A protein has these predicted regions:
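Positively charged n-region of N-terminal signal peptides that target proteins for export
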Residues: 1-5
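Bacterial N-terminal signal peptides
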Residues: 6-16
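Sec/Tat signal peptide C-region and signal peptidase I cleavage site
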Residues: 17-21
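Alpha-to-beta junction loops
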Residues: 113, 130-140, 237-238, 253-262
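Short helix-initiation/N-cap motifs at beta->coil->alpha
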Residues: 114-128, 223-226, 238-253
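A ligand-binding cleft/hinge motif common to bilobed small-molecule-binding domains
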Residues: 142-152, 248-253, 259-283
């Protein structure tokens, strides 16, 4: 999957972001870029229209769709084109994500493109470098991606998607060519979305089995997300600002009593230390977490981004299998089951939270509506299917 993804990203470097628009509107910098990779090429509306049709036509094979772009863009002659892809890997250069990306360098070079892949252990720094233009694209969590692209960032909304199968259907809809325009937001375009599993509540005391019982406890919240602190305060708990790396350490060291995290973090981040001896994991998913590849729209045209998004989607089952292998490492004794009535209460509270965050401009209303449609597709008896508020 990674080879195909990197290859598609490479091809996208050969095309100006706006050169494919039907009105063929380009900035001076984009014209200069195009002249470098395809000297003498004149783009007509007819050529752009044909390319766009081929790029979004899922009845064609990926090589056929890519070939249309290659013929139009041409290849650079002599000078290498350079782009920077920044990769957030908690283990940095020794991490599996960064290592896999580095392995593709020889594949990329044959396209006449030099890609500088930079590992980041700090998601905050990566995000700032993407904003400043030091990164042409960045791999980050969906929670962070919301700062760049509210529509895709809302996929990680609290209670928005209850399980893996619903997540699959949602991503199929999100990544469909008919939805391509929604994947561009100003200066940024979504190049890919991958599932990272459901987030659960980890506690250091099994008595904290409900939101009401979290009152007076310390809860880790992301320092860049003020709404998390607001929600925690509303249930009478104390928010403790953290980043995505320090939060697990605070939980393991007893600085915070409650931590929301995906199950894959259990072994990797040694969260069993924070739960020992009397803690556990509340068996109720808070949200479906994603990893998202966010690119600068002046560097990556949406036509190529569509192919990359589809490459991500095609590997949904493989990713979920690997996530399952990791989550299977969580011993059964850690699970805390909660009564059905409490689960229903949680669903109501999460819906209220989504509505509140939507009205504040934090969540995208179109994505929330799509998530509701997915939930109702699986269970039409839900009250929200009769009287929708999202």
């Amino acid at each position: 999957m990674l080879m195909r993804t990197i290859t598609l990203l490479t091809l996208s470097l050969l095309v100006s972001a706006q050169a494919l628009a039907e009105d063929v509107s380009m900035s001076e910098s984009q014209r200069a870029e195009l002249a470098k990779v395809a000297p003498g090429l004149t783009i007509t509306p007819e050529l752009a229209k044909k390319l766009r049709a081929a790029a979004y036509d899922q009845s064609l094979s990926i090589p056929e769709r890519v070939e249309a772009i290659r013929r139009l863009a041409g290849y650079p002659d002599g000078e290498m084109i350079k782009r920077t892809i920044c990769i957030w890997d908690i283990a940095g250069r020794s991490g599996p994500i960064y290592a896999a990306a580095q392995d593709q360098r020889s594949q990329i070079l044959q396209y006449g493109v030099e890609v500088d892949m930079i590992p980041y252990t700090s998601e905050t720094v990566l995000a700032e470098d993407l904003k400043s233009g030091r990164c042409d694209a960045g791999l980050m969590t969906g929670l962070r991606a919301r700062l760049f692209h509210r529509y895709s960032g809302t996929i990680d909304s609290v209670g928005g998607i209850p399980n893996d199968e619903q997540m699959r259907v949602l991503l199929q809809a999100v990544n469909h060519p008919k939805n391509a325009d929604n994947m561009v937001s100003g200066e940024y375009v979504i190049l890919g979305i991958a599932p990272a599993g459901a987030a659960y509540v980890f506690v250091n005391d099994r008595s904290i089995s409900s939101l009401a019982k979290a009152a007076g406890k310390k809860v880790a919240v992301l320092d860049y997300d003020r709404t998390q602190a607001e929600m925690v305060s509303q249930i009478g708990a104390t928010p403790i600002a953290s980043d995505i790396v320090s939060a697990p350490n605070k939980f393991n060291n007893g600085v915070v009593d409650v931590l929301a995290a995906p199950l894959v973090a259990y072994e990797v981040l040694e969260l069993y230390k924070g739960m020992t001896p009397n803690g556990g994991i509340v068996r109720f998913p808070l949200a479906q977490i994603t990893m998202q590849l966010v690119g600068r729209s002046d560097k990556f045209p949406n036509e190529i981004a569509q192919l990359v998004r589809e490459a991500f989607l095609q590997n949904y089952d493989l990713i979920m299998t690997r996530l399952g292998e990791e989550t299977g490492k969580v011993p059964a004794h850690w699970w805390i089951d909660i009564p059905q009535r409490d689960q229903q209460e949680y669903e109501i509270m999460m819906q209220q939270a989504r509505l509140h965050l939507r009205d504040q401009g934090y969540y995208d209303p179109e994505m929330l509506a799509l998530q509701r449609k997915v939930r109702c597709r699986f269970d039409g008896s839900r009250a929200e299917c009769v009287n929708p508020v999202e």
